[in-house]
Structure formats: C-alpha cells, structure tokens
C-alpha cells in the first residue's frame, strides 16, 4: 500500500535497522550469517493497566518481524518467533501479540503456523 508504506532503499533500511537495534526500550533479536542480517524481530513490553474494558495484563508485542526475501522459507522467522516466545515466558508476559496487514496472506499463514490466532481487526475509511 503506497498510501501507507514508505519506499524502502538499502541505505534507509540499514539506518532504520540500526536505529531499532539501538532503541533501549525495545528488545531486538537479529539472525545473521557471515555478518549479513538475515532477519530481525523487534519486541516491546506493553502493560495494560486500568483499561476501561480490558483486564490488566502484560504482553510482549512484536513491533517488527522481517526476514530477507532471499532467505524466507528457511526457518529463520520460526526461530525468531520461538525466541520471542521464550522471552515472553521469562518476562512473565501473558501473550505474544502483533499486527498484521490483511493483504499479507503469506504472513498470516506463517503466524498461524506458529500457533497465533486472529484477535481483533483494525478498520479504516479513507477521507
């Protein structure tokens, strides 16, 4: 969706990845081989406290999960998700959550294979 996503170039992607890795409020795991980044998962703890509708809880939120296109289907994403599950358990989080775009059918299928289920839907109307 070009109306939402920025155009990515190799130089701005590298800068974005370094900014993410250096963000102290986030947990970043990087899969690499021969100093080349194959995939990255970015995690953040979200605490839900005194919400009008929701019970108090602690969630490990996946902000980003990206695997290099040439290295997809090799189990890298699965390894990153499994490590996120371990971190969530160690941090005593109740759930591991993420957002996924409806049009990204491959990602939806991947996340379902990892045991995730759809929880809610974000709707929009263009103005």
Predicted ranges, named:
Residues 15-30:
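A short helix-loop-beta-strand connector motif used in the catalytic cores of GNAT acetyltransferases and
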């Amino acid at each position: 969706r070009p109306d939402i996503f920025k155009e990515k170039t190799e130089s701005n992607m590298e800068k974005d990845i370094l900014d993410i890795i250096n963000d102290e409020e986030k947990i970043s795991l990087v899969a690499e081989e021969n100093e080349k980044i194959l995939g990255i998962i970015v995690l953040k703890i979200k605490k839900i406290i005194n919400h009008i509708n929701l019970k108090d809880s602690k969630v490990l939120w996946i902000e980003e999960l990206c695997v290099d296109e040439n290295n997809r289907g090799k189990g890298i994403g699965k390894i990153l998700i499994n490590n996120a599950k371990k971190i969530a358990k160690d941090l005593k989080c109740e759930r591991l959550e993420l957002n996924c775009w409806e049009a990204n059918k491959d990602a939806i299928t991947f996340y379902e294979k990892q045991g995730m289920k759809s929880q809610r839907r974000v709707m929009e109307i263009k103005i």
